[in-house]
Design a protein with these regions (language model features):
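Positively charged n-region of N-terminal signal peptides that target proteins for export
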Residues: 1-4
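N-terminal signal peptide c-region/cleavage motif recognized by signal peptidases
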Residues: 12-14
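Short N-terminal segments immediately surrounding and downstream of signal-peptide cleavage
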Residues: 19-33
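A flexible loop/linker signature enriched in serine peptidases of the S9 family
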Residues: 19-21, 39-45, 53, 58-65, ...
Length: 231
């Protein structure tokens, strides 16, 4: 009787654990608001924004995370360490074969697709400008893009610009800065190096600071009419 009770308890606990998963992270909502992609135990899943059963998108022993949608919701880009470090991959938002886009030895993490869906914009520590006044630092990445169908990587900015989003016409890029190497998970952080929101006009190459305070301002997104920014 005792072995049966132990087995029953174990099965009950396993079923309960599967029905109440924890640590579902890095969620990102589709452009039309109907689907959410998230990371759970190193794989990507997709679920209706109204709830329901989640569909597993990746099945790999590597860690897949930080997914971002393209503008029509047909594809997602994500980071995966399938070859030792985190590279950029792209795949159908319905699952299937993932295509590797980057092959650098340093970690790379996607932020968004370009306005025309042709490029994936990502952050990485690859190459500082030759006239940079400060020695390259591991916490200060640069901004790059790579064709969504594979191709040559291009550097967009030599300064840290994270959580990038573009306006529909591609002329305005919003992002948060990174002034130093503070732990991004630090709670109630206030200091001189907290992140602020910026706007970059890609036509005039002008950067405009939107917020300036000692609290953390992060992850800006445009409102539907692009007249406001949420962060």
């Amino acid at each position: 009787m005792k072995p049966f009770l132990i087995l029953f308890t174990f099965i009950s606990f396993s079923v309960f654990s599967q029905n109440n998963p924890q640590w579902m992270r890095y969620s990102t909502i589709s452009p039309d608001g109907t689907q959410i992609v998230f990371t759970y135990k190193g794989d990507l899943y997709k679920v209706n924004s109204t709830g329901g059963d989640a569909q597993q998108l990746t099945y790999h022993n590597a860690h897949d995370y930080m997914a971002v949608w393209n503008k029509d919701g047909s594809k997602i880009a994500f980071a995966s360490n399938r070859y030792g470090n985190f590279d950029i991959y792209v795949m159908s938002s319905n699952g299937g074969q993932a295509t590797r886009l980057t092959f650098h030895s340093n970690d790379e993490h996607p932020y968004s697709f370009s306005a025309n869906n042709k490029e994936v914009v990502f952050g990485a520590l690859r190459q500082d400008a030759s006239n940079h006044r400060q020695y390259p630092h591991g916490s200060q990445s640069e901004l790059y893009s790579v064709p969504a169908e594979t191709g040559k990587v291009s550097q967009l900015l030599t300064i840290p610009a994270e959580a990038v989003n573009f306006s529909r016409n591609g002329e305005i890029m919003i992002y948060h800065d990174k002034k130093g190497g503070e732990n991004k998970w630090r709670k109630h952080h206030t200091s001189a190096i907290t992140r602020d929101i910026w706007m970059h006009n890609t036509k005039t190459n002008v950067h405009t600071m939107i917020t300036s305070n000692t609290a953390e301002d992060r992850q800006p997104v445009f409102s539907k009419n692009e007249k406001n920014i949420y962060f």
